[in-house]
Amino acid sequence: MRSENILQILMESKYTVAMCGIQMLFENGYPGLRDGDVSYDIEQKYGYSAEEILSSTFYATRKELFFDFYKKEMLEPTKIPPGKGFINLQKLEEYGLVQAEITRRLFGLLDRAGCKHAINMHGSVYENFCTHCGKEYSMEYIMEAEGIPLCQECKNPVRPKICLFGEMVDNGIVTKAAEEIQKADVLLVLGTGLHAALCHQLIQYYTGDKLILVTNEEHFSDKLANVLIYSRVDDALEKIVKAYQKKIKEKQKMEKIGHE
């Protein structure tokens, strides 16, 4: 389907929600810590898998190694700014074509791109708190701390406000995401599959008939989408944004002619 046709669907929509998957991270240059060579390198370097280290049990029992891994493998990549996929999604929000974004990714790329209505299901590395008194800390505080970051007030550990493996996702956040999807007449699934965890958990709440899937990986569940685009997400969103900008310029030109 042409970008102009997708744009028309978005322009006719009263409420569109975007669900953003891991492919958008990869397109942005972020590593897949549980994939292929990267996963192997992590096990060789730390003696454990990323999933083991980023668990509630590991955090409770091996904080020193947890934070060594966390600073190097989770915080270092944040030096990479949001790429054109996230920037163009923010533009669609700004144009009133997308009303909310939902992701399970932890790097805050939607917020950093300027999206005002992002729901970070599993939290963000940019939010941290003292496990004892609740005092909040920046990501920079975690990064600059030697070893285990400690609260300036009570000297207890400061931990990232993210959902570790073995922890339950905050029920309030799940409810908020479900409510957004229930309101949607268009669901824009970007860079993930309908079988993946993000969709599997939330897609049951969508009651519309305009599910648009943009992905670069084929899967048999793709047939459940009403509109299917095999493409990089950043390329697809860029085309939609350009189509909208072209449409607006043409409209402004016609209005100018009408006033002459």
Question: What is each residue range found by the language model?
Answer:
Residues M1-E260:
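Conserved catalytic core of sirtuin-type NAD+-dependent deacylases
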